[in-house]
């Protein structure tokens, strides 16, 4: 079995330092095999925010895979935004914008969907898709295949279609053919679990599309939260841990279980 902590939209600069410590404590207790961070580590891509994010990560002694979000690109510094958009991210977090994690049970591929030309929304291009496909297709058939982006492949009910990852349909067609099982994203500050089959309707393919909420003060009506995934093919459970201020703990609010079938992943609870 593999355990992944899926954390997104930390937004250092808009994160209570006391809560950051509680998040670290919760993650240490879980002791995940991988920490997956799906972007927006900072609020305005400032040096001090990246330094705080790096210190936060360095205190967690677990393998990690990180991708940038749109807030990790400078907003007000026009030169930096268009010429060196991810220079601070690459200096302080990781130089790798196409990270890959592999072990005996899963392969996890990260994609940079942040773009200088858009303020909020993101995009995936054909070259990136081909690179992800290459990694996914090269794995044994029983290995779980996971893709991590900041911008989402699916949307919770009521969210405008404009918030969807740019060129998502093109990407999903090819990633489905490569056997993608699971998509992790953030950006919306809303928790969500969906099936790719509901939106994309690709015959014989139904991947899980999972959104993490935010732990920052930039909430959208939800309490600070993150996800814990427990993966043991053909089963995946997804737990949502939510901050309970009265008890000063992250507690499980919801758990969903899924089972893999000939047509993809289906809910089993």
Segments (PLM) and residue ranges:
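N-terminal active-site segment of His-dependent metallophosphoesterases
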Residues: 1-59, 75-76, 96-97, 131, ...
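Active-site neighborhood of phospho(di)ester-bond hydrolases with catalytic His/Asp-centered motifs
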Residues: 6-8, 35-40, 64-70, 112, ...
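Active-site environment of divalent metal-dependent phosphoester hydrolases
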Residues: 13-16, 43-48, 70-81, 115-120, ...
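Charged helix-capping and loop-helix junction motifs
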Residues: 20-21, 49-53, 125-130, 161-171
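Extended active-site neighborhood of metal-dependent phosphoesterases/phosphodiesterases
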Residues: 51-134, 139, 174, 201-204, ...
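Short acidic, glycine-rich surface-loop motifs adjacent to enzyme active sites
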Residues: 141-156
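Conserved beta-sheet core of the metallophosphoesterase superfamily
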Residues: 160-237
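A short C-terminal boundary segment appended to hydrolase-like catalytic domains
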Residues: 230-269
């Amino acid at each position: 079995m593999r355990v992944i902590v899926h954390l997104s939209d930390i937004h250092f600069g808009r994160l209570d330092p006391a809560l950051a410590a509680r998040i670290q404590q919760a993650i240490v207790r879980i002791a995940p095999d991988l920490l997956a961070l799906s972007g927006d580590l900072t609020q305005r891509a400032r040096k001090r925010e990246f330094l705080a994010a790096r210190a936060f990560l360095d205190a967690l002694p677990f393998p990690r895979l990180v991708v940038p979000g749109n807030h990790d690109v400078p907003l007000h510094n026009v030169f930096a935004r268009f010429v060196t958009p991810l220079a601070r991210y690459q200096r302080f977090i990781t130089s790798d914008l196409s990270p890959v994690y592999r072990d005996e049970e899963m392969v996890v591929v990260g994609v940079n969907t942040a773009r200088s030309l858009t303020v909020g929304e993101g995009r995936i291009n054909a070259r990136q898709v081909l690179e992800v496909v290459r990694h996914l297709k090269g794995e044994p058939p029983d290995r779980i295949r996971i893709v991590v982006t900041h911008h989402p492949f699916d949307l919770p009910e009521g969210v405008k279609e404009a918030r969807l990852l740019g060129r998502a349909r093109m990407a999903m067609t090819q990633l489905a053919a490569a056997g993608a099982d699971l998509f992790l994203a953030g950006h919306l500050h809303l928790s969500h679990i969906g099936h790719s089959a509901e939106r994309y309707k690709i015959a014989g393919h139904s991947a899980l599309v999972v959104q993490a909420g935010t732990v920052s003060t930039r909430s959208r009506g939800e309490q600070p939260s993150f996800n814990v995934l427990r993966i043991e093919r053909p089963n995946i459970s997804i737990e949502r841990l939510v901050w309970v201020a009265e008890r000063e703990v992250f507690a499980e609010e919801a758990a969903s279980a899924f089972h893999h079938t000939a047509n993809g992943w289906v809910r089993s609870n």
